[in-house]
């Protein structure tokens, strides 16, 4: 079976590192990614996709990323769930990044 996702987009929010109770570093990276087709107005709609970064990937992204930076993210889609206050299950997916590539030079 294969669970792989590749995204190329622009950084919308800077990743901020935090630590889990077990001491692992984690950050979230919000990307704006163009859809691969044009809408009725001839423009590309955009999706905002939250990526979770762990350990060294989180550390390097937090020091290099700037708002508007073009980055590539390779990772996997992870399904999660929790029970709401009224005991109903809530399901969501997140992108867990295994690698972040910085696609612009630092001077850009």
Name what the model sees in each region.
Residues 1-108:
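Single-stranded nucleic acid-binding surfaces, predominantly the OB-fold ssDNA-binding core
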């Amino acid at each position: 079976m294969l669970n792989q996702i590749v995204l190329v987009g622009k950084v919308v929010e800077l990743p901020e590192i935090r630590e889990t109770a077990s001491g692992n570093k984690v950050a979230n990276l919000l990307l704006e990614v163009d859809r691969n087709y044009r809408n009725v107005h001839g423009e590309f709609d955009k999706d905002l996709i939250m990526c979770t970064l762990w350990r060294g990937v989180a550390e390097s992204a937090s020091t290099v990323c700037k708002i508007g930076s073009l980055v590539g993210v390779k990772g996997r889609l992870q399904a999660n769930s929790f029970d709401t206050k009224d005991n109903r299950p809530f399901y969501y997916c997140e992108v867990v990044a295994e690698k972040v590539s910085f696609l612009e030079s630092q001077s850009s």
